[in-house]
């Protein structure tokens, strides 16, 4: 179960305390009330209402077609099914890129739907928007490394930060986003050694890895991936936690424990 008392909601303060005390943070994507309830029972700390629903729920080839209305609807569903986990919702493509004011308007809609934090993709160039939101009372989770909304610009789903220049850019991005007020940051498909350096360089912003090695402050996976419900080739960073389990509750509890004790991700899941 969770580090917290079963009936005690996970808050941003508690997440910061977990980071400070070296207790790993577990996050999974979630898109509906039934799974929200299941993930809560298994002790997941953070539910990410991810725009990955475009891939695993809608059958899209990318997250780009997902709309703000989709994210509001799925956030409302997740909120109805859970009471304890902290809820983070992705801002979809096009919902925050035009201006900080546009981001504020759309982030407010997501918080009204029940989200407790919004997540947006991008590095230093998004720092102004992050600061604008945080100064107006909207908690922000940043996302660097492989940013799926930029899949066409990046030339596909590739590991980021391999070159010296790219690594320096990611380090600079992380510091700029922390200084702008982001409280959490997802690092996706980043070499484990680089993710470790970035995490160590930050004063208080908690890092959540996906394909970013074991030294982040926490881990996240797409729910459908970690229970083996995915089409095509499995990504290197994915582990099927249903293997050897009799039900999904047991698989999710196993994921939470593996994140907590540091056995996931293992070397074979890292770059």
From Swiss-Prot:
Q: Which InterPro entries match?
A: Pantoate_hydroxy_MeTrfase, Pyrv/PenolPyrv_kinase-like_dom, Pyrv_kinase-like_dom_sf
Query: Residues in the active site?
Result: 188 (proton acceptor)
Q: In which pathway does it act?
A: Cofactor biosynthesis; (R)-pantothenate biosynthesis; (R)-pantoate from 3-methyl-2-oxobutanoate: step 1/2
Any one GO CC term of the record:
cytoplasm
- Chain sites annotated for binding 3-methyl-2-oxobutanoate: 51-52, 90, 119
Instruction: List all membrane-crossing ranges.
Output: none
Query: Binding of Mg(2+): at which residues?
Result: 51, 90, 121
Keyword Transferase present in the record's keywords: the answer is yes
Q: Which cofactor does it need?
A: Mg(2+)
Record text on cofactor binding: Binds 1 Mg(2+) ion per subunit.
Q: Which Gene3D superfamilies match?
A: Phosphoenolpyruvate-binding domains
**This protein's UniProt keywords:** Cytoplasm, Magnesium, Metal-binding, Pantothenate biosynthesis, Transferase
Gene Ontology annotations of biological process type: pantothenate biosynthetic process
Enzyme class, UniProt record, top EC level: transferase
Q: What function does this protein fulfil?
A: Catalyzes the reversible reaction in which hydroxymethyl group from 5,10-methylenetetrahydrofolate is transferred onto alpha-ketoisovalerate to form ketopantoate.
* Record-stated family: Belongs to the PanB family.
HAMAP family attached here? PanB
Name of the protein in its database record: 3-methyl-2-oxobutanoate hydroxymethyltransferase
Which species does this protein come from?
Aromatoleum aromaticum (strain DSM 19018 / LMG 30748 / EbN1)
Q: Which gene encodes it?
A: panB
